[in-house]
Amino acid sequence: MIIHVEENYEAMSKKAALIVASQVVSNPAGVLGLATGSTPAGMYKELVDLFKEGIIDFSQITTFNLDEYYGLPKTNESSYYTYMMENLFNHINVPLERVHIPNGMAEDVEKECLAYEEKIRNAGGIDLQILGIGANGHIGFNEPDHKLSMKTHLVELTEKTIQDNSRFFQKEEDVPTKALSMGIGTILGAKKIILMANGKNKAEAIKEMTNGYLNPMVPASMIQAHPDVILIIDKEAASLL
């Protein structure tokens, strides 16, 4: 694992964007695994700027998002589909038929999860996976548990995650209690992983995920088993290392 400690959120975002841009330039028909939330938003802004400057071209890129809320229509302003459209896809030239986000309104959830895994396999696997990390150590929506799911699955969100995500909704009661998420095995199947974190509220999770122990109660710690991981964090998130 390579660890980059940056001065602040802006520097962290720029660093991550440059690594993603390099990946796109070197493999213009590659597959990106994408994350949502407040952490990668700055990186997406940087990528949009690089696209507008003519430095990168997304026309052959394929994308797979980590997760989506279950029971939330994609047209909902708090859906991850809406997030991705507003923060990235509306501003670059990736063909929407190459964009994949789990269908949170699927009637047959098991079928949707199996189909998502198959789409990833048919695309040749994920070349670069972007991750954030929850304050409780979750990645995607893989919550702390004694037994982690390996493949895309339906997950019950913890009270901590629901509270943390309530800032994206008008009321905490509006936050979905379930989500579809890539599993730990799906994430570890990516050829390269970038995990980003900023802020003091992520410092404990960063300490726990880099201590050398693979602990299912800290799902992010599992990426220590991956041969090509880049951790990009700001000074506050690195404060307990």
Swiss-Prot record:
Enzymatic class: hydrolase
Keyword Hydrolase annotated: yes
GO biological process, one term: carbohydrate metabolic process
UniProt-listed Pfam families: Glucosamine_iso
InterPro entries: Glc/Gal-6P_isomerase, Glucosamine6P_isomerase, Glucosamine6P_isomerase_CS, NagB/RpiA_transferase-like
CDD domains: GlcN6P_deaminase (cd01399)
Alphabetically ordered keywords of this record: Carbohydrate metabolism, Hydrolase
GO molecular function annotations of the record: glucosamine-6-phosphate deaminase activity; identical protein binding
Pathway(s) served: Amino-sugar metabolism; N-acetylneuraminate degradation; D-fructose 6-phosphate from N-acetylneuraminate: step 5/5
Active site per UniProt: D67 (proton acceptor), N136 (for ring-opening step), H138 (proton acceptor), E143 (for ring-opening step)
Keyword Hydrolase attributed: yes
Catalytic activity: alpha-D-glucosamine 6-phosphate + H2O = beta-D-fructose 6-phosphate + NH4(+)
Entry's EC annotation: 3.5.99.6
GO CC terms in record: cytoplasm
Family: Belongs to the glucosamine/galactosamine-6-phosphate isomerase family. NagB subfamily.
PANTHER family: GLUCOSAMINE-6-PHOSPHATE ISOMERASE
HAMAP family, per database record: GlcN6P_deamin (MF_01241)
Physiological role: Catalyzes the reversible isomerization-deamination of glucosamine 6-phosphate (GlcN6P) to form fructose 6-phosphate (Fru6P) and ammonium ion.
Protein's name in the database: Glucosamine-6-phosphate deaminase
